[in-house]
Amino acid sequence: MNKAYICLGSNAPLGAAAIDAAVLFVAENGSIVADTGKYPTEPEYDPRSPRYLNRILVLETELNLVSLSAITKSYETQKRIEVATAESSQGCFRRYCEVDGPKIVAIDIDIVEWNGEILRPSDKVAAYYRKGISILDGLKSVVIGAL
């Protein structure tokens, strides 16, 4: 069984729904054993961007890293196109939309850790990820304290 720490994020107007849908998709590919729930974060790379919603999932899966990465990136691309089409008459079909303004991320799905190996060091040290890990750590202490 493999264990993945997956970070979801969006700052689009329909971002909360996009994150909820992504959680359901991720759950189809294994068992979610921990979940921060959605939490707000400030944009780190473009101060003009709207606030983000993020969520970290811990997934146990039989899939290998290549397969999980491929299906999450395929889902991400499909949903970004759908959201961009719905929200922008100019159709931003890239990773994000940036039309005369701030960067808007429809949905971002990143496998940050895989079986204890850090795959995305920049995400691992980012405030949005550290905040989620802090939430997960708090959940662990509540569960342990209840025992």
Regions found by a protein language model. Name each.
Residues 44-51, 66-69, 74-147:
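Flexible, gly/pro- and Lys/Arg-enriched active-site loops
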Residues 1-5:
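Extreme N-terminal starter segment of soluble prokaryotic enzymes
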